[in-house]
Amino acid sequence: MEIGASTSCFYPLETEKALDKVISLDFKTAEVFFNSPCELEEPFVKQMRKNADAGGTKIVSIHPFSSNLENNCIFGEYQRRYDDFIGMYQKHFHAAALLGADIAVIHGALAKQKRPLPEEHYFERFASLVDVGRREGVRVCQENVVNFRSQNIDFLKRMKKY
């Protein structure tokens, strides 16, 4: 078993400083929780990777800063918004690959919607994220989060079968 830490543990410390904190605490496994689009730029990401490697820390996963937007921007019905956001998630997945991480964790859609959201729509959108992640060698993982669809184990079972 490996024990790791997420940079989110040190919020609102800037992500690179939070990673340095994880490294200085001698964690050998880490998650990077991005907090801003500028943190997805290659020079920034490569420097974090360099720091982690120098400290003997392996970054295994990332978490997009836009978790609170996934409900409307990835899983919502407005196609143009989805088209824009899928590009942002591609940048997250590319950053994950640069960091050596092969997992990207998402929250997904809220359990209670103002408008009904068919499960098939959710599953198709998630599958599209999986495809984009796969191109970067990254597995997109659904985190089970209270108040989100993923809080329901039966939903997750249906999602797995889809």
Residue map of PLM features:
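N-terminal pre-domain/capping segments
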Residues: M1-A97, A101, R134
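Active-site acidic/histidine proton-transfer and metal-coordination neighborhood
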Residues: E16-K17, N71-Y162
